[in-house]
Amino acid sequence: MPAFITGARGHDFGRHSPADLLSAIGQAGFACTQLAYTKAVEGVKSYADVTPALVAATKEAAAQTGVQIAVYGTYVELSYADEDKRKAETAKVLSQIGNANYLAAGCMGSETTPMAKQPGVSRKDAQEALLRSLGEIMPACEEAGVLFGIECVYHHAMNTPEATKMVLDTIASPNLKIICDLANYIGAENAALDAQRRIWDKVGSWYGDKICAVHFKGVAFKPDGSHYSTSLEDSVIDYAGGFAMLRQLPQASLPVLREEAVPARAASDIAFMEQFYK
């Protein structure tokens, strides 16, 4: 069973200097974070603003606070069918591999582009674009010894366990990993408990050993099927079943990162999350 390490997404704490950000995360009771410079650090509007001095200050802050960089978040659109746009997004990842390595981040991470961002593009075409992006990214990650985690999201290009398995099998890189957000696998039509359990079975048996990080957030559904964010207590997600799967995995440790964290609720959120670890 992995040792689960409770963390939080950095930009839920607002924009700060690296020292103030990691200090706030640690003081809230979290041991690790997902750091996205363009969302969480003051003065960073683009990756051009991520300077060697800033990265060095981040490494120092991590050492001082003991808050690990579990995921180096890049938030890029790897599934753009437009080649010029796709290559520009891929270039952002390539530019950050050295920084992720220097910070000893557990992995880099990205989602795979909402389908709504490119109307008229089929999911098949979006997935083929994703494969092209990963084909460019993974050799550089392998050379640097950096893991790259992609996240399955219900309304994105890579949207099901089946699609995730296809991407992993096609790319076949030992450095390609999965960020597992239980809530992001679920839509209104598969929110019933037995349907969720079938998904967890697929995730665990098909690629559970490839999971490099876990995201934890609350979701429920409106009568029209649209989803909305909730507190963890009001969520319809089957955390018990999901963690029953995660507890069977061979990884020595896994970060579990609270997304949409409210710092004032950190203590109750941590208690809620950690009840599923054993």
Give the residues covered by each predicted segment.
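Hydrophobic faces of well-ordered beta-strands that scaffold small-molecule active sites
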Residues: 2-9, 33-35, 69-74, 108-110, ...
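Acidic/histidine-rich catalytic cores of soluble enzymes
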Residues: 6-7, 33, 132-236
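Generic structural signal for well-ordered alpha-helices
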Residues: 21-23, 52-59, 93-97, 131-138, ...
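A short, acidic, flexible beta-alpha connecting loop/helix-capping segment that sits on the rim
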Residues: 13, 220, 256-267, 272
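Active-site-proximal loop/turn and secondary-structure-junction residues that shape catalytic pockets
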Residues: 12, 37-39, 76-78, 112-117, ...
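Active-site acidic/histidine proton-transfer and metal-coordination neighborhood
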Residues: 15, 19-20, 57-65, 78-180
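Catalytic domains of carbohydrate-active enzymes, especially glycoside hydrolases
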Residues: 19-39, 103-104
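Glycine-rich, proline-tolerant flexible connector loops at the mouths of alpha/beta enzymes
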Residues: 34-58, 112-118
